[in-house]
């Protein structure tokens, strides 16, 4: 086992924060990283939202978007963008053929959760794909299991306890199969407010920090936290994408980045959460300015979302042409912003990942 013991200020060694990782998990984490030990991964596991966007572009009912169309879109994104990424996140429902099209340099993560959430009851409760397991994900050649849950510390204790138990089960399953567990949590307003608006932006730091503080705990056995940036850059006064309404000054925003990083005892990477490429790049610049020890990104729609309309209206060849031009420019802009990222091995205290 690889591990690290943290020293107290007095110099004595204590083990209550002992972190370890199996050789099997370590091998897979290396496969997901670039030469510097940074995770610069692309995300293409969208399902429900992708179907809706393609349907809108085609002017058809969502049921007219076939599994073949979904696979075709995912395969094009994978083939064109993975030469510029350390890994790709796909889903077992429509993405297994796409996984075969990835560049030889790129590792593979597979989603384990059902798309969306249970909307028949409060709390945005998650569920697993019924024909998938951590073992099957590993057998399909993946280097990591990814789970997305919707989470906020401000929901009821009962709802959050269901989610805690859910993640404990997945963590144990991944641990047994020696495959890394990437946990993505996306915040929401239990009262139904607009998560892209000013009022949610004001509480977003507490949502992100509280979520990171919870799921960094050892009982969840998460290896990498896939997190939202703790602020909405459109409401950061003076940011490159500032829209005029202030939720925080730049100094306050940088403080939120630092506090979020401080609570994480596990490596964490940022997700793009559907924002524009410019907004995500600005968010990464703020992370670097704040001095946070994030270990990379898993970037999806900020790279390829404009391609959905092109595919829907003009087909796969037009999509591939767009990806080869603007899509590559988008992913390279993200890669260029990763200069301040910290290798995950350093966060784990195990030295170089090589």
Region roles according to the model:
Residues 163, 167-188, 293-308, 312:
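Amphipathic alpha-helical packing elements
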Residues 73-79, 127-144, 152, 159-160, ...:
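Alpha/beta enzyme core
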Residues 229, 272-273, 301:
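Short secondary-structure boundary segments
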Residues 6-18:
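Short, Lys/Arg-enriched N-terminal segments with co-localized hydrophobic residues
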Residues 261, 266-267, 273:
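Long, repeat-rich segments with strong aromatic
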């Amino acid at each position: 086992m690889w591990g690290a013991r943290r020293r107290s200020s007095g110099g004595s060694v204590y083990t209550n924060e002992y972190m370890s990782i199996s050789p099997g998990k370590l091998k897979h984490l290396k496969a997901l990283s670039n030469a510097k030990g940074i995770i610069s991964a692309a995300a293409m596991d969208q399902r429900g939202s992708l179907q809706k966007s393609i349907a809108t572009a085609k002017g058809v009912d969502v049921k007219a978007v076939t599994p073949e169309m979904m696979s075709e879109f995912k395969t094009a994104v994978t083939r064109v963008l993975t030469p510029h990424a350390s890994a790709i996140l796909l889903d077992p429902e429509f993405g297994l053929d796409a996984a075969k099209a990835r560049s030889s340099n790129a590792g593979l993560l597979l989603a384990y959760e059902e798309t969306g959430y249970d909307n028949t009851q409060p709390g945005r409760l998650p569920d697993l794909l019924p024909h998938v397991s951590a073992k099957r994900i590993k057998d399909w050649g993946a280097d990591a299991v990814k789970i997305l849950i919707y989470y906020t510390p401000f929901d009821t204790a009962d709802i959050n306890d269901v989610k805690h138990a859910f993640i404990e089960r997945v963590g144990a399953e991944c641990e047994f199969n020696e495959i890394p567990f990437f946990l993505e949590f996306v915040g929401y307003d239990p009262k139904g407010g607009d998560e892209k608006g000013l009022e949610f932006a004001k509480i977003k730091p507490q949502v992100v920090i509280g979520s990171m503080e919870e799921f960094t705990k050892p009982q969840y056995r998460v290896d990498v936290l896939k997190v939202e940036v703790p602020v909405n850059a459109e409401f950061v006064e003076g940011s490159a994408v500032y829209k005029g309404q202030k939720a925080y000054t730049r100094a306050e925003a940088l403080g939120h980045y630092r506090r979020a990083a401080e609570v994480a005892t596990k490596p964490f990477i940022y997700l793009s959460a559907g924002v524009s490429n410019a907004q995500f790049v600005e968010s990464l610049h703020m992370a670097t300015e704040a001095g946070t020890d994030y270990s990379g990104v898993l970037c999806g729609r900020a790279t390829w979302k404009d391609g959905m309309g092109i595919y829907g209206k003009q087909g796969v060849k037009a999509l591939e042409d767009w990806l080869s031009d603007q899509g590559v420019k988008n992913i390279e802009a993200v890669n260029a912003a990763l200069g301040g990222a910290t290798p995950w091995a350093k966060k784990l205290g195990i030295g170089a990942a090589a």
